[in-house]
Structures are given as C-alpha cells and as structure tokens.
Amino acid sequence: PPCTVQSRDVELSPEQNKAYKEMKRDLVLQAAKGPITAANEAALRLKLLQISCGAIYGANREIHHVSAAPRLRALREIMEQCREKIIVFAGFTSVVHMLHRELKKDYSVEVINGEVPAKARNEVFAAFMAAEHPRVIVADPGTMSHGLTLTAASTIVWYAPTDRTETYLQANKRIDRPGQVHATTIVQLAATPVEREIYRRLEANETMQGLVLAMAKGKL
C-alpha cells in the first residue's frame, strides 16, 4: 500500500513565540561576534526543537514548560480522524511523558523510551500488534528506529522533527513494511520555518549543518 507524507502547519503559542523570537535575536548577536561552532550549532538546533515541543531544558537539565496547546490540539485532531492505531514520535523524555498524560485521558496509550526495560517494551509491541489495546504508542524515535514491525498502525505523527536523518527514515519504516495492509501516512507537525527546513532535509537525506546559521542570517 502507498505511504504518504503530509505536512501539518500549527501555530506557536504566545509563550513559544516569545521564546522563539528571543532565541532568534540571541542567534543574530552570537553570529555577529564570530563563527558558530558545530557543537554550538547542534545545541542551538536542539533548543529550537525544545521550544517547538514546549519543554525547554536549562543549563542544569531543569525543564521549563511553556504552552504548546496549538500543537497538542492538532495532534488530537489527527488522532480523532485516524481509524487504525497510531504512533507518535517525540524526541524529549519530558515531552513523551507530557503526551502520555494528555492522551491517556481519551485513549489507551503506552510509552516507549530509554527508561522502559527491553522486556516491557517487547510486551507493549506484542500487545500493540495482536490486541485491541494499546491504541497509541508515544515514543522516543531513537528507541524504535530499527528492526520492529508495527504494521497494526497506519499513521505516524512527528510531534516535532528529529535532527537525525537515519533515525527519521528508519522510524518511519516501522509501519511501512511487509505485512502492512493499509495505506500509511507520515504526518509532520511544524510551526516554524526551521522545523519545515529540518523535515525537508530529513526527506532529502541532507546534512543539518548550516541550519542555525541560515536562521541567524534571516534566511529561515
């Protein structure tokens, strides 16, 4: 069956918009002082994705939560329209837990991330494939990017993009593989030009290098 990739535009909440503009302003100042190193660029890219998800990590790994209500609302709308099972990918532990708390109010949901032991993961995967519940898996894509067959799902939603191409491409293959009987859909949620450019580069298997600099120069 065919696999379709869909882009879904969402808005930033006022709190996210404020954080995004502040970071963009800081980027411009930083770029004016001298070159942005590769390590700095990776950290800044991660910070942008945290703003998009609504969970910003501080210097000591403390988490500052900001509202991402429009993104969560869009996810719920997608889930209401989906008849088969669904996988939601989010790259940060705090966001995975937040989504689990929100979605379990209305759906049977399991979490897969680095905190879940291998035996428990396998039990979740077996139930997902063979039983009515869980209907939803919320996962860190890095923990589900290789070897699994999860064709009980027909839809994957990226709550925000990963910046790792191999992880993205392999995670999408969990539902688009032999044994799948439904048309499959990959939905990319994005609120900023940076997110859209990350998705474009993921699909094209291009490097993320220079992304932050392009933002600092006003090209994104």
Question: Which residues fall in each region the model found?
Answer:
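Conserved Helicase C-terminal RecA-like lobe
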Residues: 1-148, 213-220
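Residue-level marker of positions within ordered structural domains that often coincide
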Residues: 25, 53, 80, 155, ...
